[in-house]
């Protein structure tokens, strides 16, 4: 998804290039991958059944900065799952969270961005991005579900 977006979106490529010039991504100082989880319920708020309620995970680079992160265009969707299906999975949200985090590491635990990942930008130039998952953003109920614990 990132590969395709950088090649086809002039705006996203420009944002990324600018941030890399002001805050380089290096092996010694990799960028932070931010995971964001939110519940989405498109049904009527007064409905008794909320069968369309979903759990959505997104990701972006924290290093893009708050101005960029305020726009949905810099967030990538990792997965969308029906809430009622998630509740049937052993471990529920914690299992889904683990599966999402697995998308950023190989079966042997290797971080895909640890050695740098090369991408071609819209203008044809290339960049190397080092990054690691190092931040999770969610409201308190979502955090509770994601780590499967009681928050008092």
Regions found by a protein language model. Name each.
Residues 11-152:
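Domain-level cores of phosphate- or acyl-group-handling catalytic modules
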Residues 1-14:
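Low-complexity, highly charged intrinsically disordered N-terminal segments
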